[in-house]
A protein has these predicted regions:
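Short glycine-rich, Thr/Ser-proximal phosphate-binding strand/loop in the N-terminal lobe
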Residues: 12-39
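Extended, highly charged alpha-helical segments
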Residues: 122-166
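Short alpha-helix plus adjacent loop in nuclease-associated cores
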Residues: 91-131
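Gly/Thr-rich phosphate-binding beta-strand-loop-beta motif of the actin/hexokinase/Hsp70
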Residues: 1-22, 119
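Glycine-rich, often acidic, oxyanion-interacting loops/wings at catalytic, nucleic-acid
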Residues: 150-189
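Phosphate/pyrophosphate-binding loops at sites that engage ATP/ADP/AMP, CoA/4′-phosphopantetheine
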Residues: 47-56
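Short glycine-rich phosphate-binding loop at a beta-alpha junction
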Residues: 56-69
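Short, surface-exposed basic-aromatic patches at helix termini and helix-loop junctions that form
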Residues: 75-85
């Protein structure tokens, strides 16, 4: 962990705040970049500048899981060829877990970049050991399967309701018959 670069990413619609620090909490930069491929390239160029001055073997990136805003930066950073030579691990953490961890920093002032700093510190103290690294293609496949299953279940419920409504409308007269006259009253008949 000593030769590791920790990156915290505070993801937003228009821009991502990146805080890059080492194990000794030396902050190399805490800057905002656009939330697009060009912005991610700018971050990678800044990391290249750091690599020219300092030695590190591994990169750990932590970002809050914010759905569609965090998915593309996570995919980009986890699949970048330059970053992969450092055995880069990208983690997306639950917003509730992050808020609980953030409450322990009660003495920090509210300013731009503080969330990115706390996310980088989350990785620095080893909180990512209980998490699984982000794998974009696996995530997309699982997401699509889950959504397809949900869609099929909803369609099945709708079709069952449709059939039951038609049965009731077609055979509503059977409801007024006595128990002895019901055509489907015998379980074994």
């Amino acid at each position: 962990m000593q030769n590791c670069l920790f990156i915290g990413v505070d993801v937003a619609l228009k821009g991502n705040q990146f805080c890059v620090m080492n194990f000794d909490q030396h902050i190399y930069f805490n800057l905002k970049f656009p939330n697009n491929p060009e912005g991610n390239d700018m971050v990678i160029n800044k990391i290249k500048d750091i690599e020219n001055k300092f030695f590190f073997e591994k990169i750990i990136v932590v970002m809050e899981s914010t759905g569609m805003y965090s998915f593309h930066p996570a995919c980009y950073l986890s699949s970048n060829e330059y970053l992969n030579k450092f055995h880069t691990e990208v983690y997306q953490i639950n917003a509730c877990d992050f808020d609980k961890y953030k409450k322990s920093f009660h003495d920090l002032e509210k300013e731009d970049g503080i969330d990115a700093y706390i996310l980088a510190d989350y990785a620095r103290v080893g909180r990512t050991k209980a998490l699984y690294p982000f794998r974009g293609s696996q995530y997309i496949a699982l997401q699509r399967l889950t959504r397809q299953r949900y869609h099929i279940c909803k369609e099945l419920i709708r079709e069952k309701a449709y059939v039951l409504t038609n049965l009731y409308l077609s055979f509503s007269g059977l409801m007024s018959l006595d128990k002895n006259e019901l055509p489907f009253s015998d379980l074994f008949g």
